[in-house]
Structures are given as structure tokens and as C-alpha cells.
Design a protein with these regions (language model features):
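Active-site beta-loop-alpha junctions enriched in small/polar residues
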Residues: 51-53, 82, 152-154, 230-232, ...
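Positively charged n-region of N-terminal signal peptides that target proteins for export
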Residues: 1-5, 20
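Sec-dependent N-terminal signal peptides
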Residues: 5-14
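Substrate-binding/active-site clefts of carbohydrate-active enzymes
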Residues: 31-46, 51-75, 81-220, 241-247
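Active-site-proximal substrate-binding groove within the catalytic cores of carbohydrate-active enzymes
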Residues: 299-345
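C-terminal motif of bacterial Sec signal peptides marking the signal peptidase cleavage site
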Residues: 16-18
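Structural recognition of the beta-strand scaffold that forms the well-ordered cores
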Residues: 44-47, 76-81, 148-149, 224-226, ...
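Active-site-proximal helices and loops of the catalytic beta/alpha 8
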Residues: 25-29, 212-214, 218, 223, ...
Length: 345
């Protein structure tokens, strides 16, 4: 039977249960026990959007509330990307970039996407300093809470140093121009034009990415990662990256993908997107509990015993692009919240 996982994401936070085997012989120790089965079986994960969490939008404003999160039963904090946001090709309204806006004040109101990273080893100055972030992690550990970072491995922003120093780290067209991410099946752009697609056929780029991942575990003592668009990155890379991180300390890995083979060696948990869309369809009257029963039966055959299927009714992406809970499932949100607390996964 799958280990229990529970997720409730409302606005800028997520609750879930998660678990996986703990690697042996961690090479560093912290003020908190290693990530492991005993902890993760009943762990509540809280997704934090630092910019929107408080009026200040800073690490320090969030850190002061960590004792309150402990009182609420939170065991893992998932922090959305903390890196600086690219200014080159920063999106404005519609298809416009901020560079298309003549008025400087008009440009400044567009803050950019967390997922257009300009430097993997730097802190977004809007949030505070590296020391502020390290204090957040240390405070969490003192309160017996783990911290995982949201990471963007598929692409960078257009002013990332690699753009200028290592253009071969990126996917290029026939004219030798770096391109934004595209659908591998159709070749059409995903529309993420504020980002540049990374080239995972380049071994040097893979090594540099793993180095950046190791940096935050070693420097800030974080406890793992949530990997953005994990289905777009080769599984072999994640397997090597996770093995490298486990050499430093036990880590918890979450994949933003619904791809069971990711959990063989690389990840502890993946997204239950099919289940999420099924709940949306049920709330609209397009499907019923018969389809839900069929889905649950299928999961018993698809997932291995130690795989974790992350059930959720919303997250920061869905809230932004598909609609709020009040818009998508106004009459069912409380019922579905209770439902995900009772289902396996």
C-alpha cells in the first residue's frame, strides 16, 4: 500500500504527507534529525511564497512566524524560488516585455517570474540577504522543521551569466540562436519567452547545474528540492544529481511531474495531476465517482510500494492560471479537502 501523502494548497501554501527511505552515513549533521521515514510519514509541508507571504515580502518577515508554523503542525517548508529574477526579456502585459515600455516607472511595476532565474547561486535582493535565508533555515531546524527549495532546472532567465559565458549550455536553433523552451513533440514554444532553454546534451552544463544544487545544501543546509517541470529534464540527470546531494546529507526530492519512473532513484514524490484534473471535472459535473474509483484502482497497479502520489486540489500554478478554489470548485472544496486526507498517496 502506498505511504500516505496529503496535500492541501491554498493560495501560497501547501500541506502534504511524504516519506522515503533515509540514506545512510550522512556526511554532515545539523540541529535537526535526518530526513527519513519516521518524520515524513506524517509530515505537513507548507509552500511559502516569500513575496506574497507578508507586506514586507522578506525572509525575516517569514522567519519570525516559523514558531507559529510549528504550532500548526508544519514539518517541511517548501520555499518558492529565492534566486534573482532576470530583467532581460522580463514579461509585462500580454506579449510585451518590460523593455517595450518607455516609462521607467511603468517598467518597474512588473516584478518578473520567480522561474526566470538570473543566477543560481545568488539571492533575490527583494527578499533579503544570504545570511537572512540561512537564518530562516536555521530557525526552521531549531523548530524541528525542514526546508526544501523550489528549483528551476529546465531553463534560466536571459541575463544569467551562462548566456554570455557558456552559450553552448543552451538549446540553439539552426542559426545558432538560443531559444526559449519548446514542446519536444511539436517544436512549438511553450510561451515561456522570458526564459532560455537549457541543453541537457551538454555534460558540462549538467555538471554546473549539480554544482549549483550542491551549493545550497552545503551553504544554507537546506533539506532538498522541489524540481520545476521535472518531466522536461532527463531522468538520468536527476538520478545523478540526487546521488550527489545524498553524499552531503539525506535530502527530500519532489518532482513537478506525473512520471513514476522519476521515483525509482531520483525523487521521493511526484504530482498527481490526473487526480487533480479529475476532481475539477467532478466539480463541474463532467465526471462522477465511478471515474474516481477507476482512477484509484489504477494507481494500485501504476505505483510501486514506496512511491508517493501527491494529491492536491490547488497550488500556486493552478491558483494563478486555472482559477481559485472558489472559481473551480466552489461547492466541493471542503469535501475534496477532506477527501485527499483519506486517500492513499
Amino acid at each position: 500500500m502506498m505511504k500516505k501523502l496529503i496535500l492541501l494548497a491554498l493560495f501560497s501554501f501547501v500541506f502534504l504527507y511524504a516519506c522515503k527511505e533515509t540514506p545512510t552515513n550522512p556526511k554532515i549533521s545539523t540541529s535537526i534529525a535526518a530526513v527519513g521515514t519516521d518524520m515524513a510519514e506524517n509530515a505537513v509541508i507548507y509552500e511559502a511564497n516569500i513575496r506574497q507571504y507578508s507586506p514586507e515580502g522578506t525572509f525575516n518577515a517569514f522567519t519570525k512566524d516559523i514558531p507559529l508554523l510549528k504550532e500548526l503542525g508544519v514539518k517541511i517548508i517548501w520555499v518558492m524560488p529565492i534566486n534573482p529574477i532576470s530583467k532581460v526579456k522580463r514579461k509585462a502585459k500580454g506579449d510585451l516585455f518590460t523593455s517595450d515600455i518607455e516609462d521607467p516607472a511603468g517598467r518597474e511595476k512588473y516584478l518578473g517570474s520567480y522561474y526566470a532565474v538570473s543566477d543560481y547561486k545568488a539571492i533575490n535582493p527583494e527578499f533579503g540577504s544570504l545570511e537572512d535565508f540561512k537564518d530562516l533555515v536555521a530557525t526552521a531546524h531549531k523548530n524541528d522543521i525542514y526546508v526544501i527549495l523550489d528549483w528551476v532546472p529546465n531553463h534560466t532567465g536571459w541575463d544569467h551569466p551562462w548566456i554570455y559565458e557558456h552559450p553552448d549550455y543552451y538549446t540553439q536553433n539552426e542559426a545558432g540562436e538560443i531559444i526559449d523552451p519548446s514542446n519536444p513533440e511539436t517544436g512549438a514554444s511553450w510561451g515561456w519567452t522570458d526564459t532560455a532553454d537549457l541543453n541537457y546534451s551538454n555534460p558540462a552544463m549538467r555538471t554546473a547545474m549539480i554544482d549549483a544544487l550542491r551549493y545550497w545544501v552545503k551553504t544554507a543546509d537546506i533539506d532538498g528540492y522541489r524540481m520545476d517541470v521535472a518531466h522536461q529534464v532527463p531522468v538520468a540527470f536527476f538520478e545523478k544529481a540526487t546521488a550527489s546531494l545524498q553524499e552531503i546529507k539525506p535530502v527530500f526530492m519532489l518532482a513537478e511531474a506525473e512520471q513514476p519512473n522519476l521515483m525509482e532513484k531520483a525523487f521521493d514524490m511526484h504530482y498527481a495531476w490526473e487526480f487533480h484534473h479529475l476532481l475539477n471535472d467532478i466539480s463541474k459535473g463532467h465526471k462522477n465517482l465511478t471515474e474516481l474509483d477507476a482512477y484509484l484502482s489504477k494507481m494500485d497497479t501504476v505505483l510501486a510500494a514506496d512511491d508517493i502520489n501527491m494529491n492536491f486540489i490547488t497550488n500556486h500554478d493552478e491558483n494563478s492560471w486555472a482559477g481559485t478554489l472558489a472559481e473551480r470548485m466552489p461547492a466541493q472544496k471542503e469535501i475534496f479537502t477532506a477527501l485527499i486526507y483519506t486517500l492513499p498517496g
